[in-house]
Amino acid sequence: MYCARRRDRQTYMAKMLVSAEHKVDAPADVVYRYVADMREHHPHFLPPAFSGFRVESGGVGAGTITRFKMTAGGRTREYRMKVAEPEPGRILTESDTGSTAVTTFTVSPQGSASIVQISTAWDGAGGIGGLFERMFAPRVLRAIYADELERLDAYAREHRPA
């Protein structure tokens, strides 16, 4: 846990991590292209929890900057994400420019299909708010990511290269 001082009190902030994984019926290179292309593909498999998705600069892979709102657990928050590709073709990250949140998409080949994992890590809140965050955020985000992954699988099946 991370400990920060605030007005002579200590506030403990836990590192939060939420992940979901799903098999996608398409080759890893195709799936990664869908994930990395923020203009032509990625917006088409975002679940309803995401709104107002737009690309501010770039569009495909590293250097792309996106902005969107996400509603989770009754709260809506705006994100401005910068995309990086620590392992191009396999791992793509989105780092929020206004917080510690980092979402990682990992695409691994499995025969003619792929295993896709979405994980988000961030510094959780302290105090009573942090307690509720630790109780509810993982369940809510995991459900959103499971929906996104199912939509990605359906999108990949629908747009299967001929």
Which residue stretches match the model-derived regions?
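Beta-strand elements of well-folded, non-transmembrane domains
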Residues: 24, 72-74, 122-126
